[in-house]
A protein has these predicted regions:
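Catalytic-site signature segments of enzymes, centered on catalytic residues
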Residues: 1-82
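A beta-strand-loop signature enriched in Asp, Gly, Thr, and Trp
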Residues: 70-79, 101-126
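Non-transmembrane alpha-helical segments in soluble domains
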Residues: 13, 17, 40-44, 55-56, ...
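Active-site-proximal alpha-helical segments within enzyme catalytic domains
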Residues: 35-42, 80-103, 162-168
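...with weaker cross-activation on analogous glycine-rich loops/strands in unrelated enzymes
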Residues: 81-95, 114-128, 150-153
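Active-site Gly/Thr loop motif
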Residues: 119-167
């Protein structure tokens, strides 16, 4: 699909700009790696730092994540759509931080309002994804019956079946 073409494009951002939208934003769920790539570039532009450098300072260091690698595109930008390698224990740290409302060791790492916005349902997915009811900012949600209670379960899903589940 387009992700393979993105990886081969001499100018990945220009390639993304040239792909027409299949639907209006927010109107239908259609996961697309191109949007994730552009989100990474937006972070770079907003922060003034490479995506991996920003993540290292703002997220990985506060979580104690010291071993990771992130693949780069031909323009030498970290691939916002994936290729981030973390140890299982480090993905668990991200999940625990989300469970703890963005706080790690008593220190706020992610703003509460941003985390709530990321987890909020933005588009329904149930018609095309039986494992999720909705998708937010890179997080899925599914209401599960757990012990007779309806509980919202949140999860991030990566290539190759990698997942982070957060069950409040």
């Amino acid at each position: 699909g387009n992700e393979d073409k993105l990886d081969e494009a001499p100018d990945p951002a220009a390639f993304v700009r040239g792909v027409p939208a299949a639907t209006a934003p927010g109107s239908a769920y259609r996961y697309n790696s191109l949007g994730s790539y552009i989100a990474g570039r937006v972070v770079e532009n907003a922060s003034g730092a490479r995506l991996d450098d920003f993540a290292a300072k703002a997220l990985f260091a506060p979580l104690g994540i010291t071993r990771w690698s992130w693949g780069r595109d031909v323009a030498n930008h970290p691939k916002g759509q994936g290729n981030l390698s973390l140890r299982a224990r480090d993905t668990a740290k991200i999940g625990q931080m989300v469970l703890d409302d963005g706080v790690v060791d008593g220190k706020r790492v992610i703003d509460t309002s941003w985390l709530q916005a990321a987890l909020a349902p933005r588009v329904a997915t149930g018609a095309v994804d039986r494992y999720a009811d909705s998708y937010g900012y890179f997080w899925y949600a599914k209401t599960q019956d757990i012990g007779g209670q309806q509980i919202a379960v949140y999860f991030a899903s990566g290539n190759g079946g990698n997942k982070i589940y957060v069950i409040p």
